[in-house]
Amino acid sequence: MKVFYNEAYTAAAHAFDTTRKSGEIATAMDEGCAPGCEVVDPIDFVDLAEELIEATHAPAYVEALRTGEPYDLAGSQGFSWDEGIWDMAVNSTAGVVAAVDEALATGGSSGSLSSGLHHARRAGGVGYCTVNGLAMAATRATELVSGTVVILDLDAHCGGGTNELIGGDGRILHLDLSTSSFDSYSPDGDDELTVLHGPSD
């Protein structure tokens, strides 16, 4: 199984588990902890990822991610902007898109060591999520297959950013099972949100 990753996933200077864990996991995989998995660089999908980010997120936010200005918008996901943020966002998105393309091309499994996705909204980052590669990859998948694309989000927090970006798109079914009400939302259409521990979390 191909699992996509490159060092740009960890290009952000802010040292935090969301910005670092993919590198540690890739190293462990390279050392044989996941037999049958091959770590693959998504470099061939970087140009497409840039196009998808520009099509999905507001122009002012994209420019802030590239330049750091305005500073508050550039760091809206919760950590300080630096020049590595844009590379991280683009390459992490490239990995998710590459994994979708690989799975559809082979009919098998594929993955990406991307993180920090489902809280990001059109106009800014939220909850340590910079851009929403999850919504972008699902939208990309609708261009490659007929039928319904399913997002199964099992993160502890709700994916309110994903809902904002793809909620109501009849080609995508968003199923969100969470243990915390952080970033909760009212699902659209057939989408579902279940929070296991109630609204006080």
Go through each PLM region and give its residues:
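Metal-dependent C-N hydrolase catalytic cores
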Residues: 1-138, 147, 201
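Conserved alpha-helical scaffold segments that buttress catalytic/binding sites
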Residues: 97, 101, 111-201
